[in-house]
Amino acid sequence: IPTGIFNAENLKDLSLLMKKTDSILRLTHEQSFFIITNDENVDLIKNSTIYKKFDSFHNIYFNNQIACAGVNECSFGVIPNKADAIEMALYLNTHIPISDAKIRMYWSACPKGCGVHGVADIGFEGAIAKDENGSSCNGVKIFIGGKATKSVLEARQLTKAISIPKAQEVVKELLNIYKTQKLENESFESFDSRILSILSIEEIQNRIGL
């Protein structure tokens, strides 16, 4: 579910499908859910309208994604956030498609960190940045290398506040390194532990053209 945006109509359709197939819905902390069902129900669920509505988001950039409410719903928010997270995921899936991988991208619209960006593989903190003309614009600070599965570790700050379009380019270059150097089925978290964590921030910045 892209950034957890799931309205009442969607929930009604899903609940009817769960009842029809005698399935169980399990929510995740990454603003999505799993459908637990029997084998004979799989095709029926995959052919349902509600499944098809969200099927295009089933890729590594949406599967483990968190984004807090953002400026439209929260007085502390600096950027829209959810829309920015969705735009980033769509951009990356177009330019750096990866199938055998896992990457946790968490977005917080302000330094308070409700999107838990500090433990993300790649975290984003909403900020005011400068565009290429020097004008103020929505932006993010990017963090990398947070740990939240096998261990817990705070992410390192990779960039100062940069515009959203610039952030897309930066993350694309970072994930290009991941795609070309990762092991089969290696998660970004494991890749960071094996490769990126032994590099200084300056070395990583140089590799991605910052």
Q: Which residue ranges define each predicted feature?
A:
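Intrinsically disordered, low-complexity regions enriched in small/polar residues
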Residues: 35, 56, 145, 190-193
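Small-residue-enriched alpha-helical segments and adjacent helix-cap loops
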Residues: 1-134
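Extended hydrophobic packing segments that form well-structured cores
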Residues: 157-210
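Mobile "lid/hinge" segments at catalytic clefts and subdomain interfaces of large enzymes
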Residues: 118, 123-180
